[in-house]
Amino acid sequence: LYVPDHLPKPGDPGHAGHVARLVVEAVELLGGRTLVLTTTLNAMRAIGEYLQTRLDPAANVEVLVQGQSPKRRLMERFREGAGDGRAGCVLVASASFWEGFDVPGDALQLVVIDKLPFPPPGDPLFEARSQRVTREGRSAFAYHALPEAAVALKQGAGRLIRSETDRGVLVVCDTRL
């Protein structure tokens, strides 16, 4: 687990750009084998665009971004990884890749999570549950938001280790951790 302490706060407008720069260095060293999980579509697009324009062509890494191809195709291509003349891959994705996406083996060595996955403000279901917890005299943050974020973080981190022999690095780009 690595939590960079030099990044701006997650709410800072430049946060996604800083995450993208951190990812470029790692992806070039690993030859891809990286999954970037974002908590918003805006961050996903910003990081994906940055990687597509800034990765060194000599690194031989294909940038896959959720929404630019069908999900099944992105998953298949990422699992193929490098080899037999294929480039390595970095996949930048949001919500639907946080769970149920398994990549056992060497095709995945690094998972980067842009920030703690708290439920989005204004979500009616989240708001209703938070109000219920508050009416019960408990803290909505401690008893609802934080546990939901912890479960989502565990799901995202779980993309990295799928078998006893898997290993890799989890980077959470949120100084609040």
Language-model regions, residue ranges each:
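ASCE RecA-like P-loop NTPase motor cores
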Residues: L1-L177
